[in-house]
Amino acid sequence: MPRAETTQSRQTIQGPTAAERARTLAYGVADGVLVAPGVPYAPVPAHTTDRDGRPLLLVRADAPIAAALAGEDDVPATLRISDVAPVPLPDRVRGRAWLHGWLSEVPDGEMRAAALRLSHAHPRPELLDLGAERDGRREWTILALEAAQVEVEDAWGSATLEPEEYAAAAPDPFVAVEAGVLTHLDSAHRGELPRLLPRSVPPGPVRPLGLDRYGMWLRCSAPPPDAPSSFDVRLPFAEPVSDLHGLRRVYRRLFARATP
């Protein structure tokens, strides 16, 4: 990841805690890969978390990881998550998380609730008929990961979390809409973004990189040969926001101040 800078000293900037950042990455927007000993790893078709942050993973019933659970209550596994910026940029990976724990199949009595939870983030047709069978076998199932340890690494730094700290946090309120907001800013307001930055930042192209309730990350670069590499700048909001109404209000203030 490019180096990160802020428009204030890091000590005075409010931002999400490591646990909140981990919960945001695990929410299900970022892609995940499931890794277990002796099992070929593969991308997870869809995943999300329940209210306590427990990952719920949709997999084919004949997938190697599902076969590894045959006759077992659970198996050790790690969910690896890579957070990629929705705006097309070089070096788009914004952060990573690793959730280590014990993987098991969701009991039949809890399968419907888990499918509904998954459908909020991923409205896939497979979730409508999880009980459907072909040749006497279920085609899809949902697995749950009980986290024993969580690691997160991003522009804020790296941290290792206990499961209680992770479960007590909440994902960012804009996790489900961030991609749409950033792509809109990039397509409709890219020319205005440089005016949001302080004069200390060298002039050059600016693209939206990240959004959370405390502020934005902007990807900055200067025309060559002045800056051979890009760098990221944190633009903090005056106060945290919790909904789209508050976000629109903050944006109006930012762009009003930036208008020449």
Feature locations, PLM:
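An N-terminal domain-cap segment
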Residues: 2-70
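Conserved hydrophobic/aromatic beta-strand scaffold that supports enzyme active sites
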Residues: 31-33, 98-100, 142-144
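C-terminal edge-of-domain segments
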Residues: 1-4, 114-260
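Catalytic micro-motifs at enzyme active sites that drive phosphoryl/nucleotidyl and oxygen chemistry
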Residues: 21, 42-46, 65-67, 84-90, ...
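Short beta-strand micro-motifs enriched in acidic
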Residues: 49-50, 106, 221
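A generic structural signal for beta-strand entry/edge sites
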Residues: 52-58, 76, 140-142, 213-215
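A general structural signal for short secondary-structure junctions and capping/turn motifs
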Residues: 24-26, 69-71, 89-90, 133-137, ...
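Short, structured beta-strand-loop surface elements
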Residues: 61-125, 149, 224-233
